[in-house]
């Protein structure tokens, strides 16, 4: 699921490629609260996505995901959480990256403090099952299920 223009580029890029028939797309603007999120999936995956939005927008997106999933669906959220970094320098760099993204992107983007993101997840009707830190260059993977 992505913006219509992004879906168009994806479909153009996979056309005629092996496995293209296994990719199913859905166009929509997740920032519009009335945009329905398709359901029935076993897994929902978001990678470095939620940090682009305000806390209110994150709760809206996650709430709609919670309404669309099955009882046994797992929701995976991969983000760079500044307070869960192995090295202090990495935490500092992520905090400074937030300033850059806020100024240069949409005015909302920031790297989350893990407690803030955990609250957003809970407020959206999801429960954190596990957090795995230090994946790749400082990513955390949060595994969630319905409350």
Residues of each region from the PLM?
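Alpha-helical subdomain
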Residues: 1-147
């Amino acid at each position: 699921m992505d913006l219509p223009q992004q879906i168009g580029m994806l479909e153009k890029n996979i056309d005629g490629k092996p496995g293209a028939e296994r990719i199913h797309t859905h166009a929509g603007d997740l920032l519009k609260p009335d945009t329905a999120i398709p359901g029935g999936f076993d897994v929902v995956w978001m990678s470095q996505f939620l940090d682009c939005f305000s806390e209110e927008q994150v709760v809206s997106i996650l709430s709609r995901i919670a309404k669309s999933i099955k009882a046994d669906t797992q929701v995976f959220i991969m983000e760079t959480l500044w307070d869960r970094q192995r090295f202090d320098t990495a935490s500092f760099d992520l905090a400074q990256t937030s300033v850059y993204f806020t100024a240069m992107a949409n005015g909302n983007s920031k790297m989350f403090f893990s407690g803030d993101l955990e609250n957003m997840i809970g407020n959206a009707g999801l429960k954190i099952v596990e957090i795995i830190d230090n994946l790749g260059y400082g990513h955390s993977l949060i595994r969630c299920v319905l409350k």
